[in-house]
Amino acid sequence: MALSWVLTVLSLLPLLEAQIPLCANLVPVPITNATLDRITGKWFYIASAFRNEEYNKSVQEIQATFFYFTPNKTEDTIFLREYQTRQDQCIYNTTYLNVQRENGTISRYVGGQEHFAHLLILRDTKTYMLAFDVNDEKNWGLSVYADKPETTKEQLGEFYEALDCLRIPKSDVVYTDWKKDKCEPLEKQHEKERKQEEGES
């Protein structure tokens, strides 16, 4: 489902710096090997806010999401393993993302079309954001991710600052709830299987 991708892991159109000159933390920068190292590993989808009412309504269906990024610096791809809880059910998905280093974007093909999102690295190394449709005022949106399911007020500070810059009220923010996660048992099963495969090889 394309919308699931949009809401949890990278999508929509590129961010245009010229249209947001006052939003310092929304200015895209090239993706380097250091950037890829920084986003390697396990991440949790924390919250998002969209001006598009349809998207805002859909994110409310997402109870919890976590995923793993495994970048390939040579091929400029990222292997994604995603665990998402919707309607008290765990949905597991794997795919490859493409990295556009100079543009600071990551993309994925959905329904034969390539969708993009800008990866925005924050001051706090344990968080990052994705910017959605910032060149389309009616559909502006942001999502924030962290290396733990719970975040501090300070960690969400840059996310809130960016929302203010885009004139998206905090009341539009939809948060996930880790207590509703149903995927942790499946993740543990996958980890056990991987360790067994490594032991046999």
Swiss-Prot record:
Location of the protein in the cell: Secreted
Keyword check for Signal: yes
Tissue: Expressed by the liver and secreted in plasma.
Signals that turn on the gene: Synthesis is controlled by glucocorticoids, interleukin-1 and interleukin-6, It increases 5- to 50-fold upon inflammation.
One Pfam family cited in the UniProt record for this chain: Lipocalin
Alphabetized InterPro entries for the sequence: A1A_glycop, Calycin, Lipocln_cytosolic_FA-bd_dom
Post-translational modification as stated in the protein's UniProt record: N-glycosylated. N-glycan heterogeneity at Asn-33: Hex5HexNAc4 (minor), Hex6HexNAc5 (major) and dHex1Hex6HexNAc5 (minor).
Keywords linked to the UniProt accession: Acute phase, Disulfide bond, Glycoprotein, Pyrrolidone carboxylic acid, Secreted, Signal, Transport
Superkingdom to which the source organism belongs: Eukaryota
Gene3D superfamilies per UniProt: 2.40.128.20
Residues of the signal peptide: 1-18
Pyrrolidone carboxylic acid: modified positions: Q19
Biological process terms in GO annotation: acute-phase response; inflammatory response; negative regulation of interleukin-6 production; negative regulation of tumor necrosis factor production; positive regulation of interleukin-1 beta production; positive regulation of interleukin-1 production; positive regulation of tumor necrosis factor production; regulation of immune system process
The keyword Zinc belongs to this UniProt entry's keyword annotation: no
Residues that span the membrane, as ranges: none
Sugar-bearing residue positions: N33, N56, N72, N93, N103
GO cellular component: blood microparticle; collagen-containing extracellular matrix; extracellular exosome; extracellular region; extracellular space; platelet alpha granule lumen; specific granule lumen; tertiary granule lumen
Residue pairs linked by disulfide bridges in the UniProt entry: C23-C165, C90-C183
Domain notes for this protein: Contains a beta-barrel that binds various ligands in its interior.
Function: Functions as a transport protein in the blood stream. Binds various ligands in the interior of its beta-barrel domain. Also binds synthetic drugs and influences their distribution and availability in the body. Appears to function in modulating the activity of the immune system during the acute-phase reaction.
PANTHER family registered for this protein in UniProt: ALPHA-1-ACID GLYCOPROTEIN (PTHR11967), ALPHA-1-ACID GLYCOPROTEIN 1 (PTHR11967:SF2)
Sequence similarity: Belongs to the calycin superfamily. Lipocalin family.
Protein name: Alpha-1-acid glycoprotein 1
Gene it is expressed from: ORM1
